[in-house]
Amino acid sequence: MKLTLQQLKVFATIARYGNLGLAANELCLSKGAVSQSLQELERQLSTPLFDRIHPRLQLNNEGRLLQPAAEELLTRMQDIENLFSPDAEPSGQLRLGASQTIGNYLLPTLLASSKQELGLPPKVTINNTHLLCHALANFELDMALIEGENHHPDLLAEPWLQDEMLVVAPPGHQLANKKELSLSRLGGETWVLREAQSGSREQFIQQIQPELPRWQPGLELNTLEAVMLAVEKGLGISFISRLAASDRLADGRLIALPLSRRFPRQLSLIWHKQKYHSTSLRHFIHFCRAQVNNAEVSRPE
């Protein structure tokens, strides 16, 4: 049996896209060449690696077993090539994921610093925590920065920065001048919330909703900016990250209602347990860890 790196590269690319045509475009090969390479790999291994569900190819048990080993080998090969590159700096494009609060309000500062110091040109995907974890589990991302909880057994989450969730309202809200509010006082309010499976929605369901004797769901929006603008316009109140709302709180477009309890939120670095850490990935993780005490990044109160 003589497997080739090209066969493994074709396999890994098909696994990411689930489609021969898309994989062929990514590899700059014909669809026929990609299909032939996969068939030869399956012949050599004496087992199919995908379930053919037209037009998609989904990894079967054998394919899922091969995927982390193939991804690791291909990444190690990239590291070997980098060892002999003229600049000897980390290279290769990292595939980073970020949930919306981090991606919109924290990651730009982080990437500006890491690009200058580390020379990393990452490809960034911004999505909700649930979808990012799904992508990590399928090796579609190298790592992610999330604010929600990880429920996937194949992923490893490392605590990173601290954020805080606030109940925000438009200026002049009837409860704004109260000294201390219990959650039960918010039961009759209309709530503007993020979509299901977002980190902030999950925290609302776990920590806020059970305390409300009654509550009125209002708009459901899939971006933080849309949620905050809706609150500004008087369409309801919301449960929002301090990190996301800081500018609007500072200039008075939003106010934080004075609750009797606080809602801290853990931000985390997360990756697949079987993910090989390339030089670039190791450098970026180290850089992220070094930002814990950086006031510009963590934005403490």
Task: Name the predicted role of every residue range.
Residues 106, 255-297:
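A late-sequence structural motif
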Residues 12-30:
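Short helix-boundary/capping micro-motifs
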